[in-house]
């Protein structure tokens, strides 16, 4: 940690080359909130009623878990759902009733949960994935084999997006986040028929 003492108060900062170390400690702390953060976002996917609404919630939570699997360590699918429900039970004891009533009741439930963790916990990762997606769209078709070039392009684009205030977290402009986003893209492309 560097300390700047020349101003009216001390400012503590990480050296520019300490990004991976900081990410390790940050992710260690975020790990305590990640399941609840995923629950917050998964609640937004509910549009049906009854058991179908619960299925939508679970499926979205599992989809998000899969999307962040290179950032965090998760339990297996069944154990994750049990943990997800337990975490939500702690914050909103009657959540199942609200979810089964559909989208409107679920949004009302979400508005009453404090603190909401999804946006603050997951924003840097989602913004990084969006920057990488934009960088991919800017590449000529068939020319994404050079990952280092793509990551450098995403870093430049990310810096631009921060300066334009189109993304909120400077932390999102991260080579390691972009590397993980590329892994997700490659997995997704393998699932598309005729590729």
What is each stretch, according to the model?
Residues 1-195:
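Membrane-interfacial terminal anchoring regions of lipid-handling membrane enzymes
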């Amino acid at each position: 940690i560097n300390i700047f003492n020349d101003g009216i108060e001390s400012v503590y900062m990480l050296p520019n080359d300490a990004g991976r170390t900081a990410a390790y400690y940050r992710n260690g702390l975020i790990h305590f909130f990640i399941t609840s953060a995923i629950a917050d976002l998964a609640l937004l996917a509910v549009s049906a009623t009854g058991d179908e609404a619960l299925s939508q919630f679970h499926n979205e939570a599992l989809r998000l878990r899969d999307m962040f699997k290179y950032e965090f360590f998760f339990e297996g699918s069944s154990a994750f759902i049990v943990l997800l429900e337990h975490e939500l039970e702690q914050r909103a004891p009657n959540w199942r009733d609200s979810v089964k009533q559909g989208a409107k009741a679920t949004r009302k439930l979400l508005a009453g949960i404090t603190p909401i963790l999804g946006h603050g916990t997951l924003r840097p990762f989602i913004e990084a994935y969006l920057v990488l997606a934009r960088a991919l769209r800017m590449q000529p078709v068939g020319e994404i084999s050079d990952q280092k070039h793509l990551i450098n392009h995403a870093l430049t684009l990310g810096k631009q997006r921060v300066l334009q205030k189109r993304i909120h977290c400077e932390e999102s402009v991260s080579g390691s986040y972009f590397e993980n986003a590329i892994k997700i893209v490659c997995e997704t492309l393998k699932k598309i028929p005729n590729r």
